[in-house]
Amino acid sequence: SGEFDFGFAYDGDADRIALLSKKYNFKGDILAIFFSKHMKNPTVIGEVKCSQVMYDTINSYGKAIMYKTGHSNLKVKIKETNADFAAEVSGHLFFNDRYFGYDDAIYATLRALELIDAGFDFDLEFEALPQVYSTPEINITVTEDTKFKIIEDLKVALQNPPSDFPKIKDIITVDGVRVIFEKGWGLVRASNTTPKLVTRFE
C-alpha cells in the first residue's frame, strides 16, 4: 500500500526470507531461479516441495538436485555436493558460491539488492516463467506410528495403479512420494516433527 518497490521480511532468527514486489510474493523456489540464473553453470539443491518449474528451469542452464525437506538436510547436502545454492519453498536460501553455504536472510537480502541494482526485474522474470497452479501445504492428521507405513503402502500401490489413474512419468522417493504426471505432480510425505502427512500438488 505504500510507495515502496520491494519488501523484505524475516522470521525470528533471520534464516528465512520473504521477498515482495508491488505485485508478487516470491517463494523460495522461485527465488532459487532468479539467483542461480546469475551463477555460472550452477548446481542447485531444492526440496521435494519445490515447483517443477524450478527444476526444469535450472536444468536448462545448470544442474538441479531434488532432496529431502528440512533446512538441516539441505545444509548437509550442500556440503556433501559443494553445490552453489540450495532453497526451500519456505524461504531458507543457502548461498555457497560467494558465501558460506548456510541460510542467512540478511545476506540473501544483499544478493537481491545486488540484482535490483543491476537492473534485474523480478516481476518480468517471474511473468516469463511457465504459469502453474500450486496448492499450499495440505496437512492430513494421522498417527505417529502409522505415518511412515502409509508412505510405504503408497509406494507399493503406485507400482500397479488403477487403469483410470493418470499416466505416471516418474516416481521420486527421496522424501515420501512425489509422483510426476504429464502436466503436474503430487507429493505425499510424512512430517518430520508432527503426526501428519504433508501433501502438495501442482
Task: Set out the residue ranges of the language-model regions.
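Phosphate-binding and adjacent anionic-ligand microenvironments
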Residues: 41-200
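Short acidic-glycine loop/turn motifs at beta-strand connectors
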Residues: 11-12, 21-23, 181-183, 192
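Short Gly/Thr/Asp-enriched flexible loops that form oxyanion-binding sites at enzyme active sites
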Residues: 15-33, 54
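Short, solvent-exposed loop/turn segments at the edges of secondary structure
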Residues: 11-14, 31, 89-90
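A conserved helix-loop-strand patch within extracytoplasmic ligand-binding domains
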Residues: 33-41
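N-terminal small/polar loop signature for handling phosphorylated ligands or for N-terminal nucleophile
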Residues: 1-19
